[in-house]
Curated annotation (Swiss-Prot):
Location relative to the cell: Cytoplasm
Any Pfam family: RRF
Role: Responsible for the release of ribosomes from messenger RNA at the termination of protein biosynthesis. May increase the efficiency of translation by recycling ribosomes from one round of translation to another.
Name of the protein: Ribosome-recycling factor
Keyword Cytoplasm among record annotations: yes
Length: 184
C-alpha cells in the first residue's frame, strides 16, 4: 500500500511539472520586443508537399536583439516562408533580400506591455489552478488507499509541500517574464 502512495506522489509530481512546462511554452509565445527564435517553433512550411517545421528548413539567428534572420537551406523556399509568416498570427511583416527573411520585432508600447503582463498573470493563474486540481486529485487518491492515519497525514503533507514548491516556481517564472516585459 505504501508503494501505491509513493507511485501516486510520483505521478502528481510529473503532472505538476508538465503543467509548468506548458505555461513556460506559452510564455515563449508572448513577444517582449526582443527576438526569440522559439516564437517560430510552431510554424510549418509546405516543403515538397509535406508540412515541415521551419526550424528544420532554415538557420534561424538573432541579430541586433530585436531581429530574427531566417536563412533557408534551400533558397527556393523564401517565397513560401514569407507567405507562411504573413499568414501566421505573429503580427510582423517579413522582409526579404533574396537570401534571408528578416523579422523585425518592434518595441511594445506601454499599453501593450500592460496587456501582455495581464496575459502572463492569467496564464500563471490557470497553471496554479491546474496544479491545485492535481493536488486535490492526489489527496483523494491517497485517502482511498488503506494507510495508517500517520502515513496518510505524511503523504497529504508531502502533496501539499510539492504543491507549494510548484506554486512558488510559477510565481518566480511569472515575475521573471513580467520583468522581461517591463525592460522591453
Amino acid at each position: 500500500m505504501q508503494q501505491l502512495a509513493k507511485d501516486i506522489l510520483a505521478s502528481l509530481e510529473t503532472k505538476m511539472t508538465q503543467a509548468q512546462e506548458v505555461m513556460l511554452k506559452n510564455f515563449c509565445d508572448i513577444r517582449t520586443g526582443t527576438a526569440n527564435p522559439n516564437i517560430l517553433d510552431k510554424i510549418t512550411v509546405n516543403y515538397y508537399g509535406a508540412p515541415t517545421f521551419l526550424k528544420t528548413l532554415a538557420s534561424i539567428s538573432v541579430s541586433e536583439g530585436n531581429q530574427l534572420n531566417i536563412k533557408p537551406y534551400d533558397s527556393t523556399l523564401i517565397p513560401n516562408i514569407k507567405k507562411v509568416l504573413l499568414a501566421s498570427n505573429l503580427g510582423i511583416t517579413p522582409q526579404t533580400d533574396g537570401l534571408v527573411v528578416r523579422l523585425v520585432f518592434p518595441k511594445p508600447t506601454e499599453e501593450r506591455r500592460k496587456a501582455l503582463m495581464k496575459e502572463v498573470e492569467q496564464l500563471a493563474e490557470k497553471t496554479k489552478v491546474a496544479i491545485r486540481n492535481v493536488r486535490r486529485e492526489g489527496n483523494d487518491k491517497i485517502k482511498k488507499v488503506e494507510l495508517t492515519k500517520d502515513l496518510e497525514t505524511f503523504y497529504l503533507n508531502q502533496i501539499q509541500t510539492l504543491t507549494d514548491k510548484n506554486i512558488k516556481l510559477i510565481e518566480k517564472h511569472t515575475t521573471t517574464k513580467n520583468t522581461e516585459l517591463l525592460k522591453a
